[in-house]
UniProtKB/Swiss-Prot annotation:
Its EC number is 3.5.1.110. GO terms for molecular function: hydrolase activity, acting on carbon-nitrogen (but not peptide) bonds, in linear amides. It comes from the Bacteria. The active site is at 41 (proton acceptor), 150, 183 (nucleophile). Belongs to the isochorismatase family. RutB subfamily. Hydrolyzes ureidoacrylate to form aminoacrylate and carbamate. The carbamate hydrolyzes spontaneously, thereby releasing one of the nitrogen atoms of the pyrimidine ring as ammonia and one of its carbon atoms as CO2. GO terms for biological process: nitrogen utilization; uracil catabolic process. This is Ureidoacrylate amidohydrolase RutB. The keyword Hydrolase applies. Keywords: Hydrolase. HAMAP family: RutB (MF_00830). The lineage of its organism: Bacteria, Pseudomonadati, Pseudomonadota, Gammaproteobacteria, Pseudomonadales. It catalyses: (Z)-3-ureidoacrylate + H2O + H(+) = (Z)-3-aminoacrylate + NH4(+) + CO2; (Z)-3-ureidoacrylate + H2O = (Z)-3-aminoacrylate + carbamate + H(+); (Z)-2-methylureidoacrylate + H2O + H(+) = (Z)-2-methylaminoacrylate + NH4(+) + CO2. The gene is rutB. It is an enzyme of class 3 (hydrolase).
Length: 245
């Protein structure tokens, strides 16, 4: 998967030199034109009090700094001409897309389990069109940003994501969002198997569960599937030449 060098037989100049992003376990060379910033599931469900994760018993009290860091990364990406892609996770209001008892998703989704335990929440959690499904107010997509709906943990499953990337010559995916140990890691892993280079900006992600879940996910990514960097390093690397981030 490479960026097109010709269109209708006409050579296209490569105007964007590769940048070296500081990362673990080693720096990674990336071209802005082959890179996308991916914002995973920054919805009220995952980042707001009263959202699904909060109602299911997960701590979302420290998501504020993550939202601020994602905003910073988005601004840097847009300034560098890097596309920003938002995922929204959820299902139709009747939950047909969630699957029934024959689907493992029906048994493992904490949103579905919470609604079965608390019938008064039926139809509220992760239902398209509802408050829970909406992106948080602080992370409103801007003109030119892309929003991709998804119905499972991995953003590659039954979505337009891979097509969106391939049609733009994207091969580097820089991940932010919630939850590091669930949808972020699932999508990055699937990208690895599809030959995408995946990087997580650790301080722009948040786990579902205790802190060790965050550290375990970052360990898995750094050791087996990709790279780990930071928002400041991303912003500095892709700042306009000659300008500070």
């Amino acid at each position: 998967m490479t960026t097109p060098t010709t269109v209708a037989g006409v050579d296209l100049p490569d105007l964007q030199p590769a940048r070296e992003l500081p990362a673990r376990p080693e720096p990674l060379r990336m071209k802005p034109g082959e890179t996308a910033l991916v914002v995973v599931d920054m919805q009220n469900a995952y980042a707001s009090l009263g959202g699904y994760l909060d109602l299911a018993g997960f701590d979302v009290s420290s998501t504020g700094p993550v939202i601020a860091n994602i905003n910073k990364a988005c601004a840097a990406a847009r300034a560098a001409g890097i596309p920003v892609i938002f995922f929204q996770n959820g299902w139709d209001p009747a939950y047909v897309e969630a699957g029934g008892p024959g689907s493992p998703n029906w048994h493992k989704s904490n949103a579905l389990k919470t609604m079965r335990k608390r019938p008064e929440l039926e139809g509220q959690l992760l239902a398209k069109g509802g408050w829970d499904y909406q992106l948080v107010d602080e992370l409103t997509p801007q003109p030119g940003d892309i929003v991709v709906p998804k119905i499972r943990y991995s953003g590659f499953f039954n979505s337009s994501f891979d097509s969106v990337l391939r049609s733009r010559g994207i091969r580097n995916l820089v991940f932010t969002g919630i939850a590091t140990n669930v949808c972020v890691e699932s999508t990055l892993r699937d990208g690895f198997h599809l030959e995408y280079f995946g990087v997580v900006l650790a301080d722009a992600t948040h786990q579902a569960g205790p802190e060790f879940a965050q550290q375990a996910a970052l360990f898995n990514i750094e050791t087996f599937f990709g790279w780990v960097s930071s928002v400041d390093d991303f912003c500095t690397t892709f700042s306009p030449v000659g300008q500070p981030s």
